[in-house]
Structures are given as C-alpha cells and as structure tokens.
C-alpha cells in the first residue's frame, strides 16, 4: 500500500472514489483525510491482530493502564511517522495535487483529557508500543471532552467540544464486547454451605460499549490498544421514564470532569469512575478467561495500573469479581488484588485527594461500599495490632472516616506499588503526606520520574531541529533518547549553533504568524518568547507572571532610563468551569494585555498574548518556538510537571522554582543553564505547618509589590475596579496561600538575569543545546522501562 509514491497515489484515488462516492475533483479535504486515515488503519490491522494474539499468549504479563484522561492530540501524522511512511504519503499526495499539511489540519484533537495527567497517559501508551511492551489503555469516550474555550471580553466561556462531529477514523466499535455496569439498587445476602453470597438487585444498568483505538509503536510492528468506553442505554431497561433514563445514561460519557460543586455533579463523577473501572475490569477478566479457566493466577499474568485516584474503585471491584463471581475466600481474593493493582499518586494538594461523601456513595454503589467497609475494618485492625492504642493514627489512615471515603487511602491499601512522579514529590509523600502509610508499607513506595514522548515532542513537533541533531550525532536518539547526550559537545560548535539559531528563528516566525491569525496580535519574532502554557490553577502561579509583567509596564512608563530586550509573554490555559478564581486570572491576563499591547510607550518592548483553547496540536507549535519556559509553581505543590521537559527538549531555558522535575533538570544541566528562584519545598512546608509568613509585610516594604497589588483595585484597569478584588484579597487579607508576594523579588531578579543573558545570543544558544543534550533522560521510554521492570513485571513481546 505504501511501497512507493505511485502505488500509494493510485490506491488513494481508488479508495477515495469507492468510499466517498465522489470523484477526486469533487472531494473535500475531509473526504481526503478520512480516506487516508482509513488506509492507515487497514494497513496496521494485521499487526493489531497479531499484537493482541501475542499479548494474550505471551508467557509473561500484560499491563492495563486505567486513566480518566488520555490527551492524545492528533494521531494521523504520528501514525504515519511511526509506520515510516510519511515521506511516501507526502510525495504521493503531491503527485495528485494534495498538500499533506492541509490534510493533517483537518483532524480534531481528541477531547479525552485536560492537562498533564492525560498527556502523560498518552505518552506512556506511545512508549509501551514503541518498546514492544504488552500494555493497553482503558478510558472513557467523552462525547464533548472537557470543553472548547472561547474568550469573550477577556472572560473564559465554555462550549461543548465537538471533536467527534466528523466521526473518528481511528476507532473501532466492538458492540459484541459490551458489558453492563450497575448503579443504585440493593444488595441481598444469603448463606449457602456456610458461606455468604451477595446479589445486587434492582440496579439501574448502563451498558458500556468499547471503542478501540490502535496505538502504533515506532517502527516496531506492535499495535497496542486504547479501549474507550461509551455509555449507552441498557437494551432491556424496564424502569420508569425512558427519556430521563436515556439522558442520565448518556451523561456518564458526555463530559470530562462535570461540575462537582453540587451533589448531582458529585454523583455523576462517581458514576464515571465506577463506569470506567467496572467496564475495564470486566473486559480484562473476559480477555483473561479466554486462555485461563481460573482467576487464581490473575496476578501472575495481569497488572492493573491506576493513574491517580479516579480509578481507585478497581480495588473493591476486583474484590467483588473474585468474591461474588469466583467464590473465593476473602484472604485469597485480597492476596490476588494486592498483587495485581499498582497506583501512581500525582499530587500533594489535599483538595485533589478525592474524598466521596458516604451519603452519596453508599446508595449509588452499594456493593462497592460493603466491600470498602470490610477492607477498612480489616486494615484498621491491622494498624491497631501494629500500633495498639494509637487511635489518632488509625483515624488518620482509615479509608472511611468523618463521613467520607478516602480514595487515595483505598488505592494505597489495595496496591502492591505506590509511586510518585519526581524525586522530591516521592520524598514528600513518604516523609509528610503519606508518612504513616510509608512506615506501615516501607517497600510499597517508590519513585518514577515522569517522561514525555520524545518522538512526538521533538521528532514530530520540531522536524528542523530533529534533522540537524541527526546530522550531528546520527538517528540512534529516535529509539534510544539517552544518546542525545552525545549532542553536548556541539554546544560550542559554531556551525551547529548557527543551524540551531536559524531553526529557532523559523519556528518563532511560524508562531508569530499563528498568534496573529488566532489572537490578532502582532508580535516581534526577534523578541524573547517567554511562555507559560498549562492548566490554570492558583498553585501554578500564572498570577506571579502577570504581576511581574505589570511591574515591567510600570517601570517602563515611569523610568525613562530603563529599557529591556523586547519580550513577548505568551499564555495558554483552561480554567475549570467552576473555578471562579482561576477564571479571574484569565481575565486579568487579558486586561494586562489590553493595557500593554496598545500603549505606544511600551508595546515595542512588551507584548502579552493569550492563546485561546490551548490543546496538544497548539502545544506542538509553541514548544519549538519558545525561548523561556515558565515553571513557577509554589515549591512542593507541582508533583513533577512535563511541560518543563517538552520545553527543555526543544531548547527553551527554564525559569523555575525548586519543585517537581525542575530539580532533576537542574541536576543534569547545571545552574548556568537554568534560572531558579524562590522558596524551597521545605521552607514552604515549614511556613504552612508553623506559620510565620505575613504577606502584608512584603506589600508594605516593597514598592513594586504595593503598586501592582493596588492596581488590581484602584481603577488602573478602566471600568474594572471591582473585577480583581478577589485576587487582591487572596494576596493580602487571605495571606497569599501560594507565596506569590514572597517569591516576587526573587522571580524579578531571575527575569533580569534572563534579560542580560539573552543579549549574549551565542552563550544562550550554548545553554539551550546543553538542555537538549540532557533531555533524553526525560523521555517516557526511560520512565516506561522503569515501570515495566520495577512495578509491572512485563517484558517485550518477541
């Protein structure tokens, strides 16, 4: 099919006419995109079947990765690259007058995630397939994703994400493998032959229908599967209002992260989580039973990984299957469960560690609650035996306490491995946040520093840079990213530096064009592109960035002797629809942009840009063009971060706190090649535990801080005097929870160092190349090898 450009072009034209019922000249770009996508899917079908057979018959284990998010982005170009046929396709299409780039832009980003959690899951799937490892994803097929972000008068407005409006060429619906998921109802117990038996009756059934997406490895022939579950009405429903039932059923897979500020939203989120877990475990068990009569050896052949706490119900659901369907004893079922399930923790933020009110949980999932109660009872008894009389410890460690079910505790107790995602994050978990659990299960905790799919974020996103790297050190880095370290000597090579700078200039011009087309702002491509793109949250401190821009604006206006190297500040972020404070930060960014971009006294030196509806395909345009990577979260709050790695891999220099993977980047590149500032994690934690921080002191003693804080409420933004009162209050009356004012001066100093260093372009480029050379460690290939060896016990398929 892809053996030559001529053969491909001929088959493409025939397939287009056959499937679309149109002549080539009458076909639309969408027709051409679907034709190409279907050809790729057909091309890999034999490998997909073979991989599934290998996974099933493999003498070792296979892994199932359960995640509420999978932020895939666009798949067509990545698949063409992984199959090694992109050049043939591009040349063949050119022969018949089609520009491949135009076809690629037709594809919608898959609306299956929000931020780092989902993108990490997608990177892991890429590495699993590219390393020939038997690993598959399990998620939900959200009809409308998170939301499509629109900016109206500086305010975020959420619209349904229409990513499926033209269908999805990659998915295969497997209705014959649908399973039923029960909600509500009652559990009845009967005793038979001295054992209790449980029946879940009068439940409301939702049918979970799987849609499978192929995950194609890079030049391996391995095609793993991402299975996404779609919620559909039960065919034999005989309850009340059928229309109401249909709406409630379809809502389960309609949106990612429905608003949970009210009970209805909490119930829907909990439904989603059990829907994912129940459907996935039934599918896993059904697949396992094809080659095994009993589930007694499940843990020897299957590893189930839960990505954050959303799939933590895998613990009681696997117990339910083993107890109620296999009639195992509690002890045997528990042994299998805690040798099958592993858990990644992604946060130290207490509000992000899910807790479900029992008064909602118990009626919705009655059998799950019964099993969790028993797990909790047995666990608390074990803690008592180890720490007799220590009621406080038991209270702190209990899975159910104070009217809630603590999902992180459930995940820890029911897993054989608990890992953090950066060294400092794992240390904080062990020494502080989960100290009691670590003392009880010292061998259960470990670290696996996150990684990114370098073939997407460098090879695909930045082909120009990839080409000059390959010219310098060969192409081994594509499959062995650690070999990028061989690039380090080229950091002082004048010819390589010139090539690097030329490519960077080209990518910056392309981003400048995109900014003008999407935001209507003219930016100077020769300016410093200073970029902060990530989920909007107070701890990520987009506010610190904005307040510093306001300070620069003030100084440029007031001090005629002050000047800076032109700097363009670029933001991209979505705020949760119910996160009022985060949405106010978005509005503030736009108000500052309005002030700065149209002031003739400063607009040649500063520009502020907010890119609407930030997503994976946009990120692929942003990272290669960036000079400065903003990784400025409050120390101890960012578990790892992966944006820092994507920027690093494309030669941007990090300005960052001593947090997450920033610390590990610093360890590799050295202090000259990164700009660190601010409080360290232990200092932040000390303030939080012992007090002593008073933000008003910084407000009173630093004129810069006082001026920008006052401007939030004194009419500086015309017609918006009350708009940012909540932000002002967060900094002063509420004492600045995330230490924005405390770190302001240190951050401003780091920005001054950036200003000075960027003027020495050769030295700046040297530091950029050093970053690229050390970025191979942060490939998800390395991360997945560690998971495979240390946690899952899986080996490459032969």
Curated annotation (Swiss-Prot):
Induction: Expressed exclusively on media containing carbon sources that allow efficient sporulation. Its EC number is 2.4.1.1. InterPro entries: Glycg_phsphrylas, Glyco_trans_35, Pyridoxal_P_attach_site. Pfam families: Phosphorylase. GO terms for molecular function: glycogen phosphorylase activity; pyridoxal phosphate binding. It comes from the Bacteria. NCBIfam families: P_ylase. This is Glycogen phosphorylase. The lineage of its organism: Bacteria, Bacillati, Bacillota, Bacilli, Bacillales. The gene is glgP.
């Amino acid at each position: 099919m892809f053996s030559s450009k001529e053969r491909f072009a001929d088959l493409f034209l025939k397939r287009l006419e056959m499937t679309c019922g149109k002549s080539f000249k009458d076909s639309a770009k969408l027709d051409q995109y679907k034709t190409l996508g279907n050809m790729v899917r057909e091309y890999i079908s034999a490998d997909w079947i073979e991989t599934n057979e290998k996974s099933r018959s493999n003498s070792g284990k296979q892994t199932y990765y359960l995640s509420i998010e999978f932020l895939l982005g666009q798949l067509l170009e990545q698949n063409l690259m992984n199959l090694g046929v992109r050049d043939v396709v591009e040349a063949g299409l050119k022969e018949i007058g089609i520009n491949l780039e135009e076809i690629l832009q037709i594809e919608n980003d898959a609306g299956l995630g929000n931020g780092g959690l989902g993108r990490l899951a997608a990177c892991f799937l890429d590495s699993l397939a590219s390393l020939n490892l038997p690993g598959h994803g399990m998620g939900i097929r959200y009809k409308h994703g998170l939301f499509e972000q629109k900016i109206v008068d500086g305010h975020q407005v959420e619209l349904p994400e229409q990513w499926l409006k033209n269908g999805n060429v990659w998915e295969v619906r497997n209705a014959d493998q649908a399973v039923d998921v029960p909600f509500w109802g009652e559990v009845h117990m009967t005793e038979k032959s001295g054992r209790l038996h449980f029946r879940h009756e009068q439940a409301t059934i939702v049918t979970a229908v799987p849609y499978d997406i192929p995950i194609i490895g890079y030049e391996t022939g391995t095609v793993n599967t991402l299975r996404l579950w779609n919620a559909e009405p039960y065919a034999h429903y005989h309850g009340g209002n059928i229309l109401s039932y249909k709406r409630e059923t379809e809502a389960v897979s309609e949106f990612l992260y429905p608003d949970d500020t009210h009970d209805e939203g909490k119930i829907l989120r909990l439904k989603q989580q059990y829907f994912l877990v129940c459907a996935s475990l039934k599918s896993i068990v059904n697949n396992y039973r094809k080659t095994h009569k009993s589930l007694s050896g499940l843990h020897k052949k299957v590893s189930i990984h839960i990505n954050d706490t959303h799939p933590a119900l895998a613990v009681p659901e696997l117990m339910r299957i083993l107890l109620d369907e296999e009639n195992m004893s509690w002890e045997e079922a528990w042994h299998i469960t805690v040798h099958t399930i592993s858990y990644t923790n992604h946060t130290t933020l207490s509000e992000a560690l899910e807790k479900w009110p029992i008064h909602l949980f118990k009626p919705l999932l009655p059998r799950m609650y019964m099993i969790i109660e028993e797990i909790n009872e047995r666990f608390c008894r074990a803690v008592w035996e180890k720490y007799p009389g220590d009621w406080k410890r038991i209270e702190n460690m209990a899975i159910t306490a104070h009217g809630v079910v603590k999902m992180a505790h459930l995940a820890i107790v029911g897993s054989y491995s608990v890992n953090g995602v950066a060294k400092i994050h794992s240390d904080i978990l062990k020494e502080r946040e989960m100290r009691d659990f670590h003392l009880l299960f010292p061998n259960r905790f470990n670290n696996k520093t996150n990684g990114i799919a370098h073939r997407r974020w460098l090879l695909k996103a930045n082909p120009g840079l990839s080409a000059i790297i390959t010219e310098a050190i060969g192409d081994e880095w594509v499959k062995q990213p650690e070999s990028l370290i061989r690039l380090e000597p080229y950091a002082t090579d004048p010819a390589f530096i010139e090539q690097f700078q030329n490519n960077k200039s080209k990518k910056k011009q392309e981003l400048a064009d995109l900014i003008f087309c999407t935001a209507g702002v003219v930016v100077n491509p020769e300016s410093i592109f200073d970029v902060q793109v990530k989920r909007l949250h107070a701890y990520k401190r987009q506010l610190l960035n904005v307040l510093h821009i306001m300070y620069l604006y003030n100084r440029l206006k007031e001090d005629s002797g002050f000047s800076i190297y032109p700097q363009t500040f670029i933001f991209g972020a979505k705020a949760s629809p119910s996160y009022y404070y985060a949405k106010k930060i978005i509005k503030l960014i736009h108000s500052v942009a309005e002030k700065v971009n149209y002031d003739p006294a400063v607009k040649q030196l500063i520009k502020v840009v907010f890119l609407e509806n930030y997503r994976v395909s946009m990120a692929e345009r942003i990272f290669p063009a960036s000079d400065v990577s903003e990784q400025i979260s409050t120390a101890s709050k960012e578990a790892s971060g992966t944006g820092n790695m994507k920027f690093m891999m494309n030669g941007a220099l990090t300005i960052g706190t001593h947090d997450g993977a920033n610390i590990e980047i610093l360890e590799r590149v050295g202090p000259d090649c990164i700009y660190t500032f601010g409080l360290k994690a232990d200092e932040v934690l000390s303030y939080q535990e012992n007090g002593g921080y008073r933000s008003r002191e910084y407000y009173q003693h630093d004129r810069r801080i006082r001026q920008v804080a006052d401007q939030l409420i004194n009419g500086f933004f015309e017609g918006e005097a009350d708009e940012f009162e909540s932000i002002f209050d967060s900094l002063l009356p509420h004492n600045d929870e995330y230490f924005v004012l405390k770190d302001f001066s240190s951050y401003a100093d780091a920005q001054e160092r950036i200003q000075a260093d960027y003027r020495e372009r050769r030295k700046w480029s040297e530091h950029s190349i050093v970053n690229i050379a050390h970025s191979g460690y942060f490939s998800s290939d390395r991360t997945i090898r560690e998971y495979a060896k240390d946690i899952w016990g899986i080996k490459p398929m032969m």
